[in-house]
UniProtKB/Swiss-Prot annotation:
InterPro entries: SfsA, SfsA_C, SfsA_N. It holds the Pfam family SfsA. One of its GO terms (molecular function) is DNA binding. This is Sugar fermentation stimulation protein homolog. HAMAP family: SfsA. Belongs to the SfsA family. It comes from Enterococcus mundtii. It comes from the Bacteria.
Length: 242
């Protein structure tokens, strides 16, 4: 995934979840749309180097999207729309391996309802298997350990529980985390942030739901899927924000 018209700037402040003010290389303060409603406190620090996509001449309230932040010489993409695009492309081109799928994917559809939830991807294989994939972006990291979530998520908890039900009805089920940064050796659930979500993941894995993590090679203007990363619920994550 490549971004066009990328400009480097420096983060000033984020008055709400959707808006941030940044200082560009011309010395101008610009208003930007933050493409991620998560907290991102460990990333969006005053003076942090950020990547902005310039989108001029539109009816938007801002002419820029804030898509990436540099932390300790590593770029973190924070575009919340990106993981789904990377996921479907990676699944279809074989970069992402989904365990237990025994033949080629012959049909897929996005945003499919099951029960009271809408899952990101629905798949059917040539041998008749049916699968749901729920995709989550991951941007929280400390000491090369990635964690989800960076804020409590009722929707995420609901998805995990619905996937358990789908698996019990015969679907192959997957939770796919796209870590929007490169340098991590393990991923986990942030139990301190949301204990009930960690419990739900334990039940889900015991029920047969597969949890998969892929990291990405990230620059200020490009994001490329890289490789599978181990997921372990027993890994202790130290939140840099707490």
């Amino acid at each position: 995934m490549d971004y066009q018209d990328v400009e480097i700037a420096y983060f000033i402040e984020r008055p709400n979840r959707f808006i941030a003010f940044c200082l560009n290389k011309k010395g101008e303060v610009v208003k930007t749309h933050v493409k991620n409603t998560g907290r991102g406190k460990e990333l969006l620090l005053p003076g942090a180097e950020v990547a902005l996509v310039h989108i001029p001449g539109t009816k938007r309230k801002t002419a820029y999207d804030l898509i990436a932040v540099k932390k300790e010489q590593q770029w973190f993409n924070i575009d919340s729309q990106l993981p789904n695009r990377l996921a479907i492309d990676g699944i279809l081109d074989g970069t992402i391996h989904l365990p237990n799928l025994n033949s080629d994917i012959e049909f897929y559809k996005r945003e499919v309802t099951f029960g009271k939830s809408k899952f990101d991807i629905y798949l059917e294989t040539s041998c008749g298997q049916k699968a749901f994939v729920e995709v989550k972006g991951m941007t929280l990291e400390n000491k090369a350990i990635g964690a989800f979530p960076d804020a409590p998520t009722i929707r995420g908890l609901k998805h995990v529980n619905e996937l358990i039900g789908a698996h019990q009805e015969g679907y192959e089920t997957y939770i796919l985390f796209i870590a929007q940064f490169e340098h991590l050796h393990q991923a986990t659930i942030h139990e301190q942030m949301q204990p009930e979500l960690a419990t739900a993941f334990r039940f889900a894995q015991q029920a047969g739901v597969q949890v998969i993590v892929y990291n990405c090679q990230v620059t200020e203007k490009q994001v490329v899927l890289k490789q599978a990363i181990p997921f372990d619920l027993n890994t202790v994550f130290e939140d840099p924000n707490l």
